[in-house]
UniProtKB/Swiss-Prot annotation:
Belongs to the class-II pyridoxal-phosphate-dependent aminotransferase family. BioF subfamily. This is 8-amino-7-oxononanoate synthase. Pathway: Cofactor biosynthesis; biotin biosynthesis. Gene3D superfamilies: Aspartate Aminotransferase, domain 1 (3.90.1150.10), Type I PLP-dependent aspartate aminotransferase-like (Major domain) (3.40.640.10). InterPro entries: Aminotrans_II_pyridoxalP_BS, Aminotransferase_I/II_large, AON_synthase_class-II, AONS_Archaea/Proteobacteria, AONS_Proteobacteria, PyrdxlP-dep_Trfase, PyrdxlP-dep_Trfase_major, PyrdxlP-dep_Trfase_small. GO terms for biological process: biotin biosynthetic process. The lineage of its organism: Bacteria, Pseudomonadati, Pseudomonadota, Gammaproteobacteria, Enterobacterales. PANTHER family: 8-AMINO-7-OXONONANOATE SYNTHASE, CLASS II AMINOTRANSFERASE/8-AMINO-7-OXONONANOATE SYNTHASE.
Length: 384
């Protein structure tokens, strides 16, 4: 089989399964409204949970940062790309979340890959929740360590995996809020089992940080858990992009020496770090509290209103509200119907989610209003 035949076969298989991904160029894609092809849609696909991507204070901070530092960092943080703006953001994140150190990464995917690649050796074991993000599972699969997956949020299964002999160290990997189901991990129970077997816990709280807990400190803070490695990302609650790893001073020093994604990547622009500092200030403020309260009210309204529709609603109290449709083609058809009626909704299909669980991944944000939720509910009940 030639290269072209191999590529064509893979694409044909995706098309036949109604699983072919495509991108839509949008004029505006975050916040309450999405604009595409000169048409405006209510946006129920954005991860901008607090509606901060268009916050004037954050935009102004980025603009001022660009004027002060330029539009790029100029290199890796190990060369010339680590600015006083990066340093200040790291220190503020560490203080906010109660860690000694924070290290910035260009994306959550890079942060997860870097930590696992740097920490895990052949004699070690990773025990990962089966529904963990692709960045975590791919990194674990590519690492020389043994990968064992435990059933979703099943602490008993995790305990059995950790109890089996392992010549090296054990790392338990999970998410705070799961990206496709919107449910939360039982972090306190997971940490207890992990500690009983002398392991370390790594939590990716991409969808919890900024959105839940006191001052938006996230899933771990809410459940009174402090994992050895906490990954937070800035493309969701912060409304920007990038990520950070929170850890001890010793682990931070280790990652600075051995995390190749950190060493060999150009740092995020200092102006972006300034915008993230402004976003963090909003998240920690009374305004941040008000945005979280509004989002919680919208979630409650949606979950109450969707009852009686012909769809299976996932058990989620987060901004991620998946409606399980099952069949790929039906999910695509329903998403298209909703778009025709003015709501931008994304159909998520295998391999992103398990076979037979194609869904509409609805996301609510603090930028929405109650009438937006009511409009969505009206369309869902009418398109069942």
């Amino acid at each position: 089989m030639s290269w072209q035949e191999k590529i064509n076969a893979a694409l044909d298989a995706r098309r036949a399964a109604d699983a072919l991904r495509r991108r839509y160029p949008v004029a505006q894609g975050a916040g309450r409204w999405l604009v595409a092809d000169d048409r405006q849609y209510l946006n129920f696909s954005s991860n901008d949970y607090l509606g901060l991507s268009h916050h004037p204070q954050i935009i102004r901070a980025w603009q001022q940062g660009a004027e002060q530092f330029g539009v790029g960092s100029g290199g890796s943080g190990h060369v010339s790309g680590y600015s006083v703006a990066h340093q200040a953001l790291e220190e503020e994140l560490a203080e906010w979340l109660g860690y000694s150190r924070a290290l910035l990464f260009i994306s959550g995917f890079a942060a997860n890959q870097a930590v696992i690649a740097a920490m895990m050796a052949k004699e070690d074991r990773i025990a990962a929740d089966r529904l963990s993000h692709a960045s975590l599972l791919e990194a674990a699969s590519l690492s020389p360590s043994q990968l064992r997956r435990f059933a979703h949020n099943d602490v008993t299964h995790l305990a059995r995996l950790l109890a089996s002999p392992c010549p090296g160290q054990q790392m338990v990997v999970t998410e705070g809020v799961f990206s496709m189901d919107g449910d939360s991990a039982p972090l306190a129970e997971i940490q207890q089992v992990t500690q009983q077997h002398n392991g370390w816990l790594m939590v990716d709280d991409a969808h919890g940080t900024g959105v839940i807990g006191e001052q938006g400190r996230g899933s771990c803070w809410l459940q009174k858990v402090k994992p050895e490695l906490l990954v937070v990302t800035f493309g969701k609650g912060f409304g920007v992009s990038g990520a950070a790893v929170l850890c001890s001073s010793t682990v931070a020093d280790y990652l600075l020496q051995f995390a190749r994604h950190l060493i060999y990547s150009t740092s995020m622009p200092p102006a972006q770090a300034q915008a993230l500092r402004a976003s963090l200030a909003v998240i920690r403020s009374e305004e941040g509290d008000a945005r979280r309260e509004k989002l919680a009210a919208l979630i409650t309204r949606f979950r109450a209103g969707v009852q009686g529709s012909p769809f299976t609603l996932a058990d989620s109290r987060s901004a991620i509200q998946p409606l399980i449709v099952g069949d790929n083609s039906r999910a695509l058809q329903l998403a298209e119907k909703l778009r025709q009626q003015g709501c931008w909704v994304t159909a998520i299909r295998p391999p992103t989610v398990p076979a037979g669980t194609a869904r509409l991944r609805l996301t609510l944000t603090a930028a929405h209003e109650m009438q937006d939720i009511d409009r969505l509910l009206e369309m869902l009940h009418g398109n069942g």
